[in-house]
UniProtKB/Swiss-Prot annotation:
Structural protein that makes short spikes at the surface of the virus. Contains receptor binding and receptor-destroying activities. Mediates de-O-acetylation of N-acetyl-4-O-acetylneuraminic acid, which is probably the receptor determinant recognized by the virus on the surface of erythrocytes and susceptible cells. This receptor-destroying activity is important for virus release as it probably helps preventing self-aggregation and ensures the efficient spread of the progeny virus from cell to cell. The gene is HE. This is Hemagglutinin-esterase. It is found in: Virion membrane; Host cell membrane. Keywords: Disulfide bond, Glycoprotein, Hemagglutinin, Host cell membrane, Host membrane, Hydrolase, Membrane, Signal, Transmembrane, Transmembrane helix, Viral envelope protein, Virion. The chain crosses the membrane at residues 393-413. Residues 128-266 are annotated as: Receptor binding. It is a single-pass type I membrane protein. Disulfide bonds join 44-65, 113-162, 197-276, 205-249, 307-312, 347-371. Glycans are attached at residues 54, 89, 153, 236, 301, 316, 358, 417. HAMAP family: BETA_CORONA_HE.
Length: 424
């Protein structure tokens, strides 16, 4: 009678010790409220136009093609669409956001604004851009692009100063020098307007170096002035180098309002596109899958640099990307990572996704959701789960009590039997 509860308790402990719930290297979701942004490796529409139709082109499981939870474009990326004429209007909304894109702007494309420019600066721009995107999509549900209207009162038009190969920069726009100016030592302005979104990601860029034109060197200077609040955002060139520099961009998160773009020297730049952020949500870390080429092409790690906890979880394969459709499409390792989108999972962490929320031999780092051996503790802005020792303490107390009872009963029966034998 006394042994039954202890037997059940010990059986439960043994069962839990034999249960394995390691973190898995996948991206997943808590429920159906999720969205994926991608490129050709998750572009179902692109596969439909191939002849013959071949879903091995993708790393995404074809079962998700009709989900309505994917915004992907072959040959493109959010960064590429943000800055260049090669544009796709990425649009999506969800509580849990996943990104699997970025490979379509890498050192392989070798983009730089001028022949003496630097692709390294553009890789830096890419990292800064995705840092803002990932941070903000941890607190916003909706992402899309919007055009930014501007008014310039001069007669000069925007110019394609910054271009390389098939890529032509059009965000921000360069306003050409007025015909009556003999050099670039002049001040010029343009009005632009942000409306319809909660917040916007816009570029503020300068040539950070000595820009040579007709034997004269110029220092770039660009400002945005919020005419409603009086806040000024600005960049001035600080480098003295004359070669090997390029277009340095900062990515500002701005509210709706009326703005003035100001140039004190060199060409005026004005934003023409913005990332539109809408519908604030409870903090939910985004998930990013490494987007890279087969080793035959040069890739970068800028999405990994941008994706940092607690706002972002980064997933990567441990092997070279080797596709089955071609070397850059249909890799088994990345297909495995995306397979987690086929099911719900209760817990996310820096190490991976936990399939069960009961116990695990691995301590979840930066956990989110219903995590193994954990309880939800809600802080004002960042819901996290932390270890709860109460169940283990209770088990220890019960085991201690059980041992004491067994010892007492054994002593009692030993003494009682000894007394009976002595009396006999």
């Amino acid at each position: 009678m006394f042994l039954l509860p202890r037997f059940v308790l010990v059986s439960c402990i043994i069962g839990s010790l034999g249960f394995d719930n390691p973190p898995t290297n996948v991206v997943s979701h808590l429920n159906g409220d999720w969205f994926l942004f991608g490129d050709s490796r998750s572009d179902c529409n692109h596969v439909v136009t191939t002849n013959p139709r071949n879903y091995s082109y993708m790393d995404l499981n074809p079962a998700l093609c009709g989900s309505g939870k994917i915004s992907s474009k072959a040959g493109n990326s959010i960064f590429r669409s943000f800055h260049f004429t090669d544009f796709y209007n990425y649009t999506g909304e969800g509580q849990q956001i996943i990104f699997y894109e970025g490979v379509n702007f890498t050192p392989y494309h070798a983009f730089k604004c001028t022949t003496s420019g630097s692709n390294d600066i553009w890789m830096q721009n890419k990292g800064l851009f995705y840092t803002q995107v990932y941070k903000n999509m941890a607190v916003y549900r909706s992402l899309t692009f919007v055009n930014v209207p501007y008014v310039y009162n001069g007669s000069a038009q925007s110019t394609a100063l910054c271009k390389s190969g098939s890529l032509v920069l059009n965000n921000p726009a360069y306003i050409a020098r007025e015909a009556n100016f003999g050099d670039y030592y002049y001040k010029v302005e343009a009005d632009f307007y942000l409306s319809g979104c909660d917040e916007y990601i816009v570029p503020l860029c300068i040539f950070n170096g000595k820009f040579l034109s007709n034997t004269k060197y110029y220092d770039d200077s660009q400002y945005y002035f919020n005419k409603d609040t009086g806040v000024i955002y600005g960049l001035n060139s600080t480098e003295t180098i004359t070669t090997g520099f390029d277009f340095n961009c900062h990515y500002l998160v701005l509210p709706s309002g009326n703005y003035l773009a100001i140039s004190n020297e060199l060409l005026l730049t004005v934003p023409t596109k913005a990332i539109c952020l809408n519908k604030r949500k409870d903090f939910t870390p985004v998930q990013v899958v490494d987007s890279r080429w087969n080793n035959a092409r040069q890739s970068d790690n800028m999405t990994a640099v941008a994706c940092q906890p607690p706002y972002c979880y980064f997933r990567n394969s441990t092997t070279n990307y080797v596709g089955v459709y071609d070397i850059n499409h249909g890799d088994a390792g990345f297909t495995s990572i995306l397979s987690g989108l086929l099911y719900d999972s209760p817990c996310f962490s820096q190490q991976g996704v936990f399939r069960y929320d009961n116990v695990s031999s691995v301590w979840p780092l930066y956990p989110y959701g219903r995590c193994p051996t954990a309880a939800d503790i809600n802080t004002p802005d960042v819901p996290i789960c932390v270890y709860d020792p109460l169940p283990i303490i209770l088990l220890g107390i019960l085991l201690s009590v059980a041992v004491i009872i067994i010892v007492v009963l054994l002593l009692y029966f030993m003494v009682d039997n000894g007394t009976r034998l002595h009396d006999a």
